[in-house]
Amino acid sequence: MDLEQKTRGLSKSCALLIVIAGMERYAFKGVASNLVTYLTDVVKMSNSRAAKTVNTWAGFTSMLPLFSAPLADTYWDRFFTILASSSVYFVGLVGLTWTAFAGSRSATKTISSYFLYSSLCLVSIGLGVLNPSLQAFGADQLDHDLDKNFDLSSGDQKDAKATRKTQFFQLWYFGVCTGSLMGVTVMAYIQDTFGWVLGFAIPGIVIFLSILVFMSGCGIYVYAPGARLKKKTTTTPFEKILKFIKGRVVKQRSIYTLADEKDLDAMELELEERPLCKCETEDIETPSTTSKGLEDDESSKTVFSGIDNVKLVIRLFPIWMMLLMFAVIFQLPATFFTKQGVTMKRNIGSNFKIPPATLQSTITLSIILLMPLYDKILIPITKRIKKNGTGISVMERMGVGMFLSIIAIVIAAIVERKRLAISQKMKTLPDYDPETVPLSIFWLLPQYILLGISDIFTVVGMQEFFYSEVPVRMRTMGFALYTSVFGVGSFVSAALISIVEAYSSSTGDRQNWFADDMSEARLDKYYWLLALTSTISFVVYIFLCKFFKSSSDQGDEKEEAPK
């Protein structure tokens, strides 16, 4: 079997998990893409508060994997973790549906708001545990597939595995984008046309079906060793890190521990006995020292292994930090881009209005349409130019996406300035409509499409980057680092909105950049601010890439994947 045949397709278990990931995205995007509209139109929040609520919720959802992933890697079984988290996810969506139903029949919003936040928290908890576990479970299937099928010479095998790995992440992301596309387009129309009860009920039904689909594949999955077995036979990387940190803390405390006051006068300094030649004493064992020596040796191995694992994770954080502004920009389509679209001309014919959230589908649609071109055109060209088996590197891929996101936000600022200028001119006319600007919503398409193209480069690159740069048995943690970029980015976005809002409306005649009246808001200035900060992050990222060395380049020993 030649290299091309071996890199052609994935196993049935990988394909099934990709379908499940697409169903999960359908449900999540069906709720998240239009949530800001629900909060402003139904719950009656201000624009800034609704945007901060959505960003905080998205951040909380994306940050949870950082806490759940170590537990999943160390103690939990991935299969049952996926089942349990999917069930919590389903309960949260049922609660969200009940909230919309109760709110539509109650004049008071107190109970409805309480259950709204509770339901959103359940969705966050379920999704925050499900996502990294599902991806890591898919990686288990991939590793088994690679070890089973590849028996090539070392150089060819490395390129073949890299190609198959990239193919897996691209197909995974293709499935995720397909689900997102369906969720944004179909659910936004249903929510705007048939109401929020049905709009929240359908995602719950989809998650319930995904649980049934997942359980149908029990016979074809490859299962990693259970948590109990792992705990008995070997120490996990996360446990080694904890032991290393605990050992350092205990050591520091022992240094500064003084003797009791009554013994201070009798203190005597003694030098520790050490052999002159370490090599001659390593093989000598005595009954009094053998057990202690073995214990010290095991402790030493744990310490050094802990140091290695800590270094492997910590060295990723400079790159992780520079990706945050990319994540901040990606919060805009679900918040301010959608609010912009509400004020623009959305009619197609006389009877149909485009739901503003539907434009988010152009991001995923551009990904679905352009990703094959990436594989068939860009990768072969870069392979010929760089004369290697992989083409564009993961670091270069993320950098291209960051650059395109900056271009997208610059275009967004220019379009918003044009919308504001038309709005100001319309105020002088007698038939002025403050809720609609005679500017087609399709003016927003370029910024959406560019964000979709940048997504192909950066998001898929981030998945592969964090997957490849952590120890194999910390893989769930690697996926958690990827999702945490968007989690912290959401919190950074909410913090920026609060700071800018406080600054722009604090004194004098300054107008709130996020005013509820979109004809008075200055989102263009906010977009220019994001363009500036993103450019700074991009420049620093390029600088860091020159000094970053991949773990594979360093020759780090990797633990073997479960078979």
Swiss-Prot record:
Transmembrane segment boundaries: 56-76, 82-102, 110-130, 168-188, 194-214, 317-337, 362-382, 394-414, 441-461, 479-499, 528-548
Molecular functions (GO terms): transmembrane transporter activity
Entry comment describing in which tissues the protein is expressed: Expressed in roots and flowers.
Subcellular location: Membrane
InterPro entries assigned: MFS_trans_sf (IPR036259), POT_fam (IPR000109)
Phosphothreonine: modified positions: 81
Membrane-topology descriptor: Multi-pass membrane protein
Keywords linked to the UniProt accession: Membrane, Phosphoprotein, Transmembrane, Transmembrane helix, Transport
Pfam families: PTR2 (PF00854)
Cellular component aspect of the GO annotation: membrane
Family from the record: Belongs to the major facilitator superfamily. Proton-dependent oligopeptide transporter (POT/PTR) (TC 2.A.17) family.
Full protein name: Protein NRT1/ PTR FAMILY 5.9
Organism of this sequence: Arabidopsis thaliana (Mouse-ear cress)
Gene it is expressed from: NPF5.9
